[in-house]
Amino acid sequence: SCVGEYGRCRSAYEDCCDGYYCNCSQPPYCLCRNNN
Protein backbone atom coordinates (compact mmCIF):
# COMPACT_ATOMS: atom_id res chain seq x y z
CA SER A 1 0.00 0.00 0.00
CA CYS A 2 1.09 3.57 -0.46
CA VAL A 3 1.27 6.55 1.85
CA GLY A 4 -1.20 9.42 1.38
CA GLU A 5 -0.85 13.14 1.93
CA TYR A 6 0.97 14.12 5.15
CA GLY A 7 1.69 10.47 5.86
CA ARG A 8 5.18 9.59 7.02
CA CYS A 9 7.54 8.23 4.40
CA ARG A 10 11.16 7.33 4.06
CA SER A 11 13.39 9.14 1.58
CA ALA A 12 12.22 6.73 -1.11
CA TYR A 13 9.79 8.34 -3.54
CA GLU A 14 7.96 5.01 -3.92
CA ASP A 15 6.53 5.21 -0.40
CA CYS A 16 4.00 7.84 -1.47
CA CYS A 17 0.83 7.35 -3.49
CA ASP A 18 0.62 8.52 -7.09
CA GLY A 19 0.64 12.30 -7.27
CA TYR A 20 2.67 12.69 -4.08
CA TYR A 21 6.35 12.95 -3.28
CA CYS A 22 8.35 12.39 -0.12
CA ASN A 23 9.29 15.75 1.38
CA CYS A 24 12.06 15.73 3.98
CA SER A 25 12.36 19.50 4.50
CA GLN A 26 10.91 19.34 8.02
CA PRO A 27 12.95 16.93 10.15
CA PRO A 28 12.73 14.62 11.97
CA TYR A 29 10.11 13.14 9.67
CA CYS A 30 9.62 12.94 5.93
CA LEU A 31 6.01 13.49 4.88
CA CYS A 32 4.21 12.80 1.62
CA ARG A 33 3.10 16.00 -0.08
CA ASN A 34 1.11 16.74 -3.20
CA ASN A 35 3.21 17.21 -6.34
CA ASN A 36 1.20 20.28 -7.26
UniProtKB/Swiss-Prot annotation:
Its main location: secreted. Keywords: Amidation, Disulfide bond, Ion channel impairing toxin, Knottin, Neurotoxin, Secreted, Toxin, Voltage-gated sodium channel impairing toxin. Transmembrane segments: none annotated. SUPFAM superfamilies: omega toxin-like (SSF57059). Disulfide bonds join 2-17, 9-22, 16-32, 24-30. GO terms for cellular component: extracellular region. One of its GO terms (molecular function) is toxin activity. Insecticidal neurotoxin that induces irreversible neuromuscular blockade in house crickets (A.domesticus). Modifies presynaptic voltage-gated sodium channels (Nav), causing them to open at the normal resting potential of the nerve. This leads to spontaneous release of neurotransmitter and repetitive action potentials in motor neurons. This is Mu-agatoxin-Hc1a. It comes from Hololena curta.
